[in-house]
């Protein structure tokens, strides 16, 4: 089988497409013929070695994939069944989806929801799944379309762009924050009512004028601090990323004076029931147009170059990897 293999040499991560024997696949009760995978920000950190994502080498990256079960010892899945996977540490500490085959635990798989195929599932991928969990977090906090504008930071990335499309479809007024002017038309086509430059979020006071009913933040650091300072009374921020850094230079003021909620969103260890619910929502809530405008297709061998481009903020929307 062909696979993108990460190896470490003199402290550097080296990525190359290699032919591997299937016997080298890790333990698991379902072996999957992978048709599609994708490149997420975390994959880019792993492939470039820019983030301490991978501790054990050699490793096949790819934190999500979709394909067909080849063999299964799990009664919930049968040979020939379409399945998808996101999270569970796959592509980080268990060989992942950037290979023609993957072997995983049945507990980690989701049967392909009706209305999706492998390609569409990976246009959504970890990024879209995370975006849906963020939207559900805002709903759980009682944020409704009539409450006011929702701001999405890092809006041109995979999570942000899907969040814009979902929120727009659900009737919310969406304001997108992006550091790149070249993405503005794209974000408007997804449903953003207006777009703000990221440098407007560089500095903040402990409290600012109330602007946002809700927020989805993929950036962290000063951007998240500014968003918190601008939240309406009783508003909620769903935070799921650290593209701008992992620190948070904020104060307790938004929380104790404006009743603001900061809700963390993790997609890796999401329990199976919530996971299935999110995928059903994605099938129902993503407009059909999303699948045509939001994805670029690449091959396994192109993944390292595209990983660099993702780190350098040069890619908009989703990057699909055609594996088989």
Summary of predicted features, one role per range:
Residues 128-129, 154-161, 220:
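Glycine-rich NAD(P) Rossmann-fold beta1-alpha1 loop
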Residues 81-82, 101, 149, 169, ...:
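Residue-level marker of beta-strand positions
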Residues 168-223, 280:
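Adenosine-nucleotide cofactor-binding segment
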Residues 98, 179-186, 246-252:
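Short, glycine/polar-rich helix-capping loops at beta-to-alpha or helix-loop-helix junctions
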Residues 23-38, 50-90:
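Glycine-rich beta-strand-centered segment in the early N-terminal region that forms part
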Residues 222-289, 323-324:
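Glycine-rich phosphate-binding loop and adjacent beta-alpha segment
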Residues 273-324:
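C-terminal hydrophobic helical "lid"/dimerization subdomain
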Residues 86-151:
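NAD(P)H dinucleotide-binding glycine-rich loop of Rossmann-like/cofactor-binding domains
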């Amino acid at each position: 089988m062909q696979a993108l293999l990460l190896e470490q040499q003199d402290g550097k991560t080296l990525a190359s497409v290699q032919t591997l024997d299937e016997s080298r696949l890790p333990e698991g009760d379902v072996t999957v013929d992978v048709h599609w995978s994708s490149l997420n920000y975390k994959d880019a950190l792993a492939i470039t070695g820019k983030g301490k994502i991978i501790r054990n080498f050699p490793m096949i990256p790819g934190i999500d994939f979709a394909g067909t079960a080849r063999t299964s010892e799990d009664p919930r899945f049968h040979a020939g069944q379409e399945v998808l996977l996101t999270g569970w540490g796959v592509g980080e500490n268990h060989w992942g989806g950037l290979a023609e085959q993957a072997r995983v635990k049945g507990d980690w798989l989701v049967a392909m929801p009706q209305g999706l195929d492998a390609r569409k599932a990976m246009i959504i991928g970890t990024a879209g799944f995370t975006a849906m969990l963020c939207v559900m977090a805002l709903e759980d906090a009682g944020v409704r379309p009539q409450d006011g504008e929702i701001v999405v930071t890092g809006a041109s990335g995979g999570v942000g762009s899907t969040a814009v499309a979902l929120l727009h479809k659900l009737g919310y007024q969406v304001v997108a924050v992006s550091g790149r002017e070249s993405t503005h038309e794209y974000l408007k086509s997804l449903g953003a009512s207006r777009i703000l430059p990221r440098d407007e979020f560089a500095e903040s006071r402990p409290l600012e004028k109330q602007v946002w009913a809700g927020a989805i933040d993929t950036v962290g650091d000063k951007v998240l601090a500014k968003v918190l300072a601008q939240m309406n009374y009783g508003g909620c921020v769903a935070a799921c990323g650290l593209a701008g850094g992992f620190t948070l230079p904020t104060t307790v003021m938004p929380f104790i004076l404006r009743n603001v909620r900061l809700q963390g969103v993790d997609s890796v260890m999401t329990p199976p029931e919530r996971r299935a619910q999110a995928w059903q929502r994605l099938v129902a809530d993503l407009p059909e147009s999303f699948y045509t405008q939001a994805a670029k297709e690449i091959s396994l061998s192109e993944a390292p170059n595209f990983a660099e481009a993702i780190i350098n903020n040069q890619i908009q929307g989703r990057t699909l990897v055609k594996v088989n």
